[in-house]
């Protein structure tokens, strides 16, 4: 397992260096990633500083629920294509399957590397929310435990969603001749959503804060797991345990399903 993880990590870094037909040093790649993350963090710090108004309204759980939603969305968006490439389009899939290695071991070695990437995106959204809450309201040991366990659960949940969506992407791309069209469509959609959110950020935030109580009622009624995530991050031990079990359970279920059909899917 350890050797498989090393191979997958080296292979992923090699493909990143070769993307676009140009060689780039590892230091340059790391530098670009750090720069992008710093830019994201600055935006999120400003965002969560404004969103602390929910905490003053007695809706601390909603503040953390929104943090969980954003973390999950960012992690899935940032990791889904890498997951699809690493799990289903890796060139050594058939070679590894021909060896006395169980499909679950192959999957786990690759997911271990992917979990690091998913964790980076997840924490990029959660840490600013945690920091702003701590700065304005302080923290307790119980809240910190809730933060740690909830973050771990969201990372597992995000990776499970990425694996499922990666399977769908693999199935679609295997039936499309011009794969560049899919990449172009994805890029255009991303730019449209990005510029819409960027140009309407102030209005969206204002509407969100004005509708806080209505949103809270809707979440409690129709999306209880999100309420549980928010309560767990707010220090509620039962909700923290529920969130942890949910994330681990979904990840285990998806991993089992993928392992059972892995050989058929990639060959």
Predicted regions and their residues:
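Hydrophobic alpha-helical transmembrane segments of membrane proteins
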Residues: 1-93, 103-267
